[in-house]
C-alpha cells in the first residue's frame, strides 16, 4: 500500500511534539505552518529525485522544424538521455554537447540546419528548453526523452510519494533537517545535523540503485 503525505506528516508532528498527529493539518506551537512544511517536503522530494535519478520518465515530443530551441516537458528537472526518432521510426542517440564542442564540430552551428541534429545542449538560463543542433529539417521527426520529472506536490490530502517506499524515511528526515535548521524559535542545529546525516545516508544508498532505475511511462 503506497505511503501518503498524511502518514509522514503525522509522524513529523509527533517527532516535533505537535500533537498526536492529524495528517499535517495543524501545528499548535506556531513555529511552523502547514504550507511551510508541505513546501519543505515537496522540495526535499524533488531534490532527492534530481540527485539520485532513481525514477525516470519517458516521453516522445515532436520536433519543431528549423528551430534549435525545443520546449522541454513542463515537469522536467534533469535529462538522462535523448534520442532522435526519424519518420521511419528509427532511433539514434543525441550526445550532450556544450558550445565549445559545437564550435569544433560545426563552426556555423548557431544558424545551421540538417535533416537530423548531431547533439543537444542545455543551459542554465532557459530551464525548460532543450537546444538541438543543427536545427532539424526532417519531417515527422521527434525527440525520445528520458528524464527526471518533478515529484507530485504534497497537499496533506493523501498524496502518494513519488519515490520508492524504502526511501520515504529519507524524505522525512530531509524535511526535518529543513524544519530544525530554519532561523527562529524552531532552530535546533544539533537535531538538524542528525536529521541531515540520515538524509545523506539514504541519498547515497539511492545513488547506488540509480543504474537499475525504472521508468514511468
Residue ranges and their predicted role:
Residues 1-217:
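Glycine-enriched, solvent-exposed interface loops adjoining structured elements
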